[in-house]
């Protein structure tokens, strides 16, 4: 089975550890997958939309082109991401906000969240706040990701090696809650009816090892424990372990995606 050693694209409202410039340069997969999903929805131009976990704002800006007679706002917990988004897309509305703890006192036609929800610890509270921003008939569209077991094992084993373990003393790993995809339960308890739940793979081929390296370097949360120099070494060793595990230098990664569609009752 292929595993994804570089799976950490689902972010931006829970952990403020990514370098926004690096992430923006190495997040094509996230953007293209989200854009493809949006294009399938054929959103009417007069809809009001909120993008939860908007990150650098690139996909929020794309949404703004779809709702020219409506409106869109992007929210994210990471203030550096919001600062970047405001500077890069000055005609789009962005706000620093943690969906786990607060919601906007406004009702939206559509709520979207791309590659964000798995990183949220308190998913039930988040669904509750999402529901409060929806009116009867409002739609919720989510793309998320499932963490592959061998992927987790490789990273955990690397952190336990003698030359790395001192960097991770008392480290709280996000792996503990990443695979919680009980979205139907959280939605139902929040007044949102599940309309669709699908798990599927999207293959993505990186052009070379350096691209794969940069992708990991941009978004792997464990790197926040390390100096810049050590981060480069950590990723190099991680990729070496990965290629050794699969038995080849295969740059095609199968990302396992969760699609959830819900409607406010």
From Swiss-Prot:
Keywords: Methyltransferase, Signal, Transferase. One of its GO terms (molecular function) is methyltransferase activity. Pfam families: Methyltransf_31. Residues 1-17 form the signal peptide. GO terms for biological process: methylation. It comes from the Viruses. SUPFAM superfamilies: S-adenosyl-L-methionine-dependent methyltransferases. InterPro entries: Methyltranfer_dom, SAM-dependent_MTases_sf. Its EC number is 2.1.1.-. Belongs to the methyltransferase superfamily. This is Putative methyltransferase 235L. The lineage of its organism: Viruses, Varidnaviria, Bamfordvirae, Nucleocytoviricota, Megaviricetes.
């Amino acid at each position: 089975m292929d595993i994804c050693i570089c799976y950490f694209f689902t972010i931006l409202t829970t952990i403020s550890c990514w370098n926004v410039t690096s992430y923006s340069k190495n997040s094509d997969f996230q953007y293209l997958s989200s854009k493809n999903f949006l294009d399938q929805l054929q959103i009417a131009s007069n809809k009001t939309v909120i993008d939860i976990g908007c990150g650098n704002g690139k996909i929020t800006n794309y949404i703004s082109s779809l709702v020219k007679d409506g409106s869109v706002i992007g929210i994210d917990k990471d203030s550096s991401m919001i600062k970047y988004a405001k500077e890069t897309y000055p005609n789009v509305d962005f706000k620093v906000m943690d969906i786990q703890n607060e919601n906007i006192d406004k009702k939206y036609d559509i709520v979207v969240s791309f590659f964000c929800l798995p990183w949220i610890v308190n998913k039930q509270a988040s669904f509750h706040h999402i529901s409060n921003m929806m009116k009867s008939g409002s739609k919720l569209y989510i793309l998320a990701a499932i963490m592959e077991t061998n992927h987790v094992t490789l990273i955990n084993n690397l952190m336990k090696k003698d030359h790395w373990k001192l960097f991770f003393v008392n480290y709280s790993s996000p792996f503990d809650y990443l695979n919680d995809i009980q979205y139907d339960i959280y939605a139902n308890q929040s007044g949102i009816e599940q309309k669709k739940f699908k798990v599927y793979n999207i293959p993505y081929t990186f052009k070379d090892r350096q691209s794969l390296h940069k992708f990991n370097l941009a978004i792997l949360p464990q790197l926040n424990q390390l100096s810049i120099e050590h981060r480069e070494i950590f990723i190099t060793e991680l990729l070496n372990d990965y290629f050794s595990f699969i038995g080849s230098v295969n740059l095609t990664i199968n990302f396992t995606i969760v699609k959830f569609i819900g409607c406010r009752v």
